[in-house]
Amino acid sequence: MLCIFYIARLCNLIIYSLYSLLMFPMQKLISFMFGNLNPFDSVLDKDEKIQDNINTNHKPIESKEINNDLPLTVLDKKDTSDINIRNDNGVFDFIKIPNPFKKHYEYYCNQNTIKEPPRKGLVERMMNMVE
C-alpha cells in the first residue's frame, strides 16, 4: 500500500514539473503581451502594478445621540446617502421566493381543481356489474 502511495506521489511530481516547464514560457509571453495588466503576480512587484482608484471621499456616518424629546417622525428618518441601503420601496415584492422546506404539492397543486369522485371499491364494482 505504501508503494502505491509513493508511485502516485512520483507521478504527481512528474506531471507538476512538466506543467511548470510548459507554463513558465507562457507566463513570460503573457506578461510581455499585457504589460501591467498581466494576471500573473510573480512577474511584477505589487508596487509596479496599476492601483485601483478607491474613492476616499466616503465619510462614515457619525453616530448621533438620540434626543427623546423629538417627535417620532424626526427619529425615523434614515440617511439615504449610503449606497447599501435598499430603497426599492417594494418594487420586487412580486417575486415570491419558494420555501425549500414545504412540500411540492403545497406550491404547485391548485386548490380550485375539480376533485374526482372517490373510486369505488372492487365489491361495489362487482355489484354494479351484476345488476
Swiss-Prot record:
Which Pfam family, any one, appears in the UniProt record?
DUF2718
Origin species: Sheeppox virus (strain KS-1)
Please state what the protein is called. T3C protein
